[in-house]
Amino acid sequence: MNSYLFRIGSKTSGFLRSTQFVRSYSKHVKSESYKKALEDVETQVAESPCILYMKGIPERPECGFSNTAVRILQAEGAVFTSYNVLKNNDMREAVKEFGDWPTIPQLYVKGQFIGGADILMGLYKSGELSKLLNEAGVVKKDE
């Protein structure tokens, strides 16, 4: 998957590359429920203009990184759907595989993987996130 991170030319650390190797080396036989979860992620990403896979719900995030991602999106006025990956372990693992990204939260806008909390924070601080969300048409308009 061609993520926003890689489109803007960011490089991954050696640690991330080694983590990806271990994950690909240790992949287990996929259960039917896992395959279904992977299909569900693909469908959700395709059908949702802006979706955040997170731990918890926006009103009650269950980890600091998910909280950060939610607060950033709210500060930008983004209209987004969320999915609590803690409800389903197959879904949590499917999200990680789909985005080829080892951590949660994960944000997708118009089918494109944007990143996790740290990347969102960097994009937010630089103003790039505002531009990206506005261009995607996922920001609430003042009436």
Curated annotation (Swiss-Prot):
Record PANTHER family: GLUTAREDOXIN FAMILY MEMBER, GLUTAREDOXIN-RELATED PROTEIN 5, MITOCHONDRIAL
Binding site for [2Fe-2S] cluster: 63
Gene that encodes it: grx5
Keyword field: 2Fe-2S, Iron, Iron-sulfur, Metal-binding, Mitochondrion, Redox-active center, Transit peptide
Alphabetical list of Gene3D superfamilies matching this protein: Glutaredoxin (3.40.30.10)
Cross-referenced InterPro entries: Glutaredoxin, GRX_PICOT-like, Monothiol_GRX-rel, Thioredoxin-like_sf
Keyword Iron-sulfur in record: yes
Subunit structure: Homodimer.
Chain sites annotated for binding glutathione: 55, 92-96, 104, 117-118
Location(s) in or outside the cell: Mitochondrion
Function of the protein: Monothiol glutaredoxin involved in mitochondrial iron-sulfur (Fe/S) cluster transfer. Receives iron-sulfur clusters from scaffold protein ISCU and mediates their transfer to apoproteins, to the 4Fe/FS cluster biosynthesis machinery, or export from mitochondrion.
MF (Gene Ontology): 2 iron, 2 sulfur cluster binding; metal ion binding
A Pfam family per the record: Glutaredoxin
Name of the molecule in the record: Monothiol glutaredoxin-5, mitochondrial
Protein origin, superkingdom: Eukaryota
The species this protein was found in: Dictyostelium discoideum (Social amoeba)
Domain named Glutaredoxin: residues: 38-140
Annotated SUPFAM superfamilies: Thioredoxin-like (SSF52833)
Family: Belongs to the glutaredoxin family. Monothiol subfamily.
A cellular component annotation (GO) from this entry: mitochondrial matrix
Transit peptide: first to last position: 1-25
